[in-house]
Amino acid sequence: MEKQYKAVFFDLGGTLRIAFLKEAYMRHARRKMAEIAGTDMPYEEFYQMIEERYEPYRKWALGEFKESGDEELWCKWLLPDYDPVRIRQVCHELSFQYRQCKGRREVVDGGVEVIKGLHERGYKLGIISNLIGENEVPDWLEEDGLDSYFDTVILSSVCHMRKPCSEIYDLACQQIGVKPEECVSVADNIKRDIAGAKKAGIGCNIIFRSPEKKHPVEFTEENRPDYVIEDFREILNILP
C-alpha cells in the first residue's frame, strides 16, 4: 500500500532541538562574542548593546517575513559602527556565539530515534527553520552524523524568507521533488508554523508541545493542527 505522505519537514527550535538555559555556557558565549568582535566594552555591556540593536532587526524580520544572512545582520544591523572588514571575517562565528547566549541546544529526547525510524520507512526528510546564522545547523548535522538523513535543509538565514511565508515550504518541496500535500510538517508554533504550512498546502501538520512550552493554547480553524503530541516518539505511531 502506497504511503499517503512522502516527506516530513521538521522545525528546529522547540521541536527537533531544545534550548537548555545553562548559565555557565551562556556566559562563556557572551564573553566569546565580545572577544571575536574586538570590542573594548565589558562583555556584559557589549551583549546588552547587541540585544538592544537586535530588537529593530527582529521587528523588521517578523514584519517582512525576511531574514538577513550573517554578513548583513552584523555589518548593517548589529555592528555597523565596527570595522566592516573584521566583522565580515567573523560574522558566522558571531552569529553562532550569539545564539549560544540564549542556551545550549540539544536534540529533543527521541529525536534521533524518529529521524532514523522515518528514514528507514522511506520518508524524505527536511528541515525548515527560522533562525539567524548560516553555518550552525549544517555543522551540527555533520558533527552528530545526521546530515545523511536529510534531503533538504532550508534556513531563513540562507534563503532570506521566514515562516509563515508559504514560499519557504514551496522551496523545500521543490528541492526534494514532492507536492505540498504529500508532506508532513512537525513544528511547535501554531501561529507561525501552522499558518505558513496550511497556506502552502502541506498535507499534515503535527504540533509538538515541547517540555518548555506547556502553556495553554487556543486552536482556531486557521491554526488547528492534525495532531498534537507531547512525546516526540509519537510521530512514529502517526506515520507508518
Model-inferred region functions:
Residues 1-8, 20, 35, 41-44, ...:
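Asp-based, Mg2+/Mn2+-dependent phosphohydrolase catalytic module
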Residues 2-109, 113-121, 134:
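N-terminal helical cap/lid subdomain that shapes the substrate entry/recognition surface
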